[in-house]
Design a protein with these regions (language model features):
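Beta-solenoid repeat scaffold
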Residues: 91-112, 118-135
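Leucine-rich solenoid repeat scaffolds
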Residues: 360-396
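Sec-dependent signal peptide cleavage junction
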Residues: 20-36
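Parallel beta-helix/beta-solenoid
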Residues: 76, 96-98, 122, 127, ...
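Acidic Gly/Asp/Thr-rich repetitive segments characteristic of extracellular carbohydrate-active
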Residues: 40-82, 88
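Extracellular beta-strand/beta-solenoid scaffold signature
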Residues: 65-70, 89-92, 110-123, 141-152, ...
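Sec-dependent N-terminal signal peptides of Gram-positive bacterial secreted proteins and lipoproteins
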Residues: 4-24
């Protein structure tokens, strides 16, 4: 009798699952199973849900994997997506607000890039609360994508942790455009393929929104390119290698001169405990950034000194235009401390080419080497207040 009862229950359960899978297959369906709630797409289970947590089940091809993951990630409700297998997708995933992606040590391979959002308004709160934990994110080409792998724009409260991102030297592993309150922690961003001697693309790009710095946004809407900068960006415990390692960008000349005003300057950028290498340009270049902290980092450019300013290890510069008023307040401080820096023309170089000087510049406790000689290891020009102390300088 017990055996017969088990058979009947199994039959009823199988019929329930079958009916749910084949009803209204144009959209995503759910059915309660022993392992939780099965979420289906195209008559196949794509995830098992427990509350707001979804355990993704890979599908048969890259396009369906991307569609299924995008369905799970869309919307504004709080959700956690667990990727528990290696996954191949055909193009970018577009997560919604309040999304956490846990990828562990699994590899997500894309025929294009991997993460993107398309903002609808020029506001830091247009997209918010995205967390990416883990994963090896790469392009299907062995030489990497000559574009952007993760592009996040007009966003706030973004956290990227323990991820590895591979990109071509001509591309960007992570591009932040007009973002606020971002943490990139314990990540590896590494370029692939061959690096030309004149390549200046960075693996971590911190951008303002202008037609030349954010052409993808300009194609979406011209209104998105109003010169909004980034603020409150923290990069810590990361290993980054590219033509350039990290760059806070500035708008071009000519028609873009209107985006070289004080309101377009990045602020409160922190780079801490990182190992950053530039192969054909600066390891770290912070342009039009009025406040920044770089500390406890190993910073090396392998660029020949004949490349002049591109061969600097750590560069901070105001470009031509109308800069912020030079003050000594904390909102206008550049602090470079306890770093090991190797450069060509200079190891550390700080200068204003704009209408105003920088505010306070602190360079202390660093070990700085320059191929051009010990006297060129550290140069700080055009600052209202300068503190240079307890540094060791060398030629290498």
């Amino acid at each position: 009798m017990r055996k017969l009862r088990k058979i009947l229950l199994s039959t009823i359960f199988a019929l329930t699952v079958s009916t749910t899978f084949f009803a209204n297959t144009a959209g995503t369906q759910t059915v309660t199973a022993a392992s939780g709630t099965a979420v289906t797409f195209k008559r196949k289970v794509i995830a098992y849900r427990t509350g707001s947590v979804y355990n993704f089940v890979p599908m048969g091809n890259a396009a369906d994997n991307r569609r299924a993951l995008s369905l799970l990630m869309e919307g504004n409700e709080k959700k956690v997506i667990n990727i528990n297998n290696n996954v191949h997708i055909d193009t970018y995933l577009r997560p919604g607000n309040n999304t956490t992606i846990n990828a562990g040590k699994h590899t997500i391979t894309s025929d294009k890039g991997v993460i993107i959002n398309d903002p609808t308004a020029a506001s830091y709160t247009n997209f918010k609360n995205l967390t990416i934990n883990g994963g090896i994110w790469k392009n299907s080409s062995s030489s990497g994508l000559a574009g952007t792998m993760m592009r996040i724009s007009y966003a706030s409260n973004i956290s990227i942790n323990n991820t590895t991102v591979y990109t071509n030297y001509k591309g960007h592993g992570i591009e932040l455009i007009s973002c606020s309150n971002v943490v990139v922690n314990n990540c590896t961003l590494k370029a692939q393929g061959k690096c030309s001697k004149t390549c200046v693309e960075e693996q971590l790009q911190i951008d303002l929104a202008s037609p030349t710095t954010a052409p993808g946004l300009y194609r979406l809407s011209k209104k998105l390119c109003n010169g909004t900068p980034c603020k409150n960006i923290t990069v810590k415990n990361c290993t980054i290698q590219g033509a350039r390692g990290i760059c806070a960008n500035f708008a071009g000349a000519g028609n873009e001169a209107k985006y070289r005003k004080a309101r377009n300057y990045h602020s409160n950028i922190t780079i801490e405990n990182c190992n950053v290498t530039g192969i054909s340009a600066e390891a770290i270049a912070l342009f039009n950034t009025k406040s920044a902290t770089v500390k406890n980092c190993r910073i090396t450019t392998k660029t020949p000194k004949s490349r002049n300013s591109y061969s600097v290890g750590l560069a901070v510069a105001y470009q031509k235009g109308s800069a912020p008023k030079a003050t000594t307040k904390t909102k206008n401080v550049i602090s470079l401390t306890n770093n090991a820096v190797k450069g060509g023309q200079q190891g550390i170089f700080v200068r204003s080419n704009a209408s105003k000087k920088l505010g306070t510049v602190i360079v202390s406790g660093n070990t700085v080497s320059a191929k051009k000689g010990k006297k060129n290891a550290i140069k700080v020009l055009s600052a209202k207040k300068v503190k240079i102390a307890k540094n060791k300088t060398k030629k290498w």
